[in-house]
Curated annotation (Swiss-Prot):
GO terms for cellular component: blood microparticle; haptoglobin-hemoglobin complex; hemoglobin complex. Heterotetramer of two alpha chains and two beta chains. Belongs to the globin family. The lineage of its organism: Eukaryota, Metazoa, Chordata, Craniata, Vertebrata. SUPFAM superfamilies: Globin-like (SSF46458). The keyword Ligase does not apply. The keyword Ribonucleoprotein does not apply. Residues 2-146 form the Globin domain. Heme b binds at residues 63, 92. This is Hemoglobin subunit beta. Keywords: Heme, Iron, Metal-binding, Oxygen transport, Transport.
Amino acid sequence: SPFSAHEEKLIVDLWAKVDVASCGGDALSRMLIIYPWKRRYFEHFGKLSTDQDVLHNEKIREHGKKVLASFGEAVKHLDNIKGHFAHLSKLHFEKFHVDCENFKLLGDIIIVVLGMHHPKDFTLQTHAAFQKLVRHVAAALSAEYH
C-alpha cells in the first residue's frame, strides 16, 4: 500500500463518519457551480441553467452519491486503487469521453466538502492523508488516458 498504517487509520476512521449521499451531492453540485462548463456532461439530467437548478436537481445529487460511494471503494482497496478503478477508467475514457482533469478537480472538491462536513475530525494529518488518496484515485481513473 502507498499509505502508511497511520494514514490508513485516518482515512478509514473519517470515512466511517461520512454521509455519502449528503457529501456526494454537495461535491458534484459544487463542481458544476464552480466550473459551470462541466454541466455539459450532465445535460441529460434536465435543466441546469442556474446554480439553483444544479443545487435542486435530484439526478445531480443522486449521481454525486454514486460517485462518492465509488470513491469510498478506494478506502476498502487502499492497496490496489489502480486495479480497482481500471474498469471505471476505461468507461470514462471510451464511453463518456470525460477529460481526466475532472478527476483531480472533483477530488479537490471532495476534500473541501469533507472538511466542511467534519471540521473537528479533519485535522491537518487527515487532510494530508485524504489529499494523497484523491491523488491516487485521480491517477487510477486517468490510467486509460495514457
